[in-house]
């Protein structure tokens, strides 16, 4: 076991516009080179645009998009007797959120609309409709876990 002291979990302050911790976390994950104001602008613009298109409140749209992208299971590599197995494990709620946000941001960055706000808005809308790259990533993760179900007894 490690003798090092575990890093304390830092609590994130809610964002100024919506007063929501999830939005603040999303902004922090989107931020590049410490430019938080730019990231905030992009996220707020994306939520506003997507909310108008879908006739939904911005926060509920983000929540729903994250809900549709959250993975329930994932695979972790486990070495047993010289062979490496992909063992399916359940994903903790905090990691579910982190993965969902990471996948949404990654999918938005790989799109080719003009502005990042536009890309993010379209990715949110596609996630709510259960299509798009982020949802595909979640399905792929679930498929991997399903395919390796036989190794579930190696869980630790």
Curated annotation (Swiss-Prot):
Gene3D superfamilies with a match to the protein in the record: Ribosomal protein S7 domain (1.10.455.10)
Entry superkingdom: Bacteria
Tagged with keyword tRNA-binding: yes
GO process annotations (BP): translation
Cysteine pairings via disulfide bonds: none
MF term (GO), any: rRNA binding
Keywords, in A-Z order: Ribonucleoprotein, Ribosomal protein, RNA-binding, rRNA-binding, tRNA-binding
Pfam annotation, one family: Ribosomal_S7
GO cellular component: small ribosomal subunit
Role of this protein: One of the primary rRNA binding proteins, it binds directly to 16S rRNA where it nucleates assembly of the head domain of the 30S subunit. Is located at the subunit interface close to the decoding center, probably blocks exit of the E-site tRNA.
UniProt-listed PANTHER family: RIBOSOMAL PROTEIN S7 (PTHR11205)
Subunit: Part of the 30S ribosomal subunit. Contacts proteins S9 and S11.
HAMAP family (alphabetical): Ribosomal_uS7_B
UniProt-listed NCBIfam families: rpsG_bact
Family as reported in the entry's similarity comment: Belongs to the universal ribosomal protein uS7 family.
The name this protein goes by in its record: Small ribosomal subunit protein uS7
Organism: Dichelobacter nodosus (strain VCS1703A)
Source organism phylogeny: Bacteria, Pseudomonadati, Pseudomonadota, Gammaproteobacteria, Cardiobacteriales
Gene name of this polypeptide: rpsG
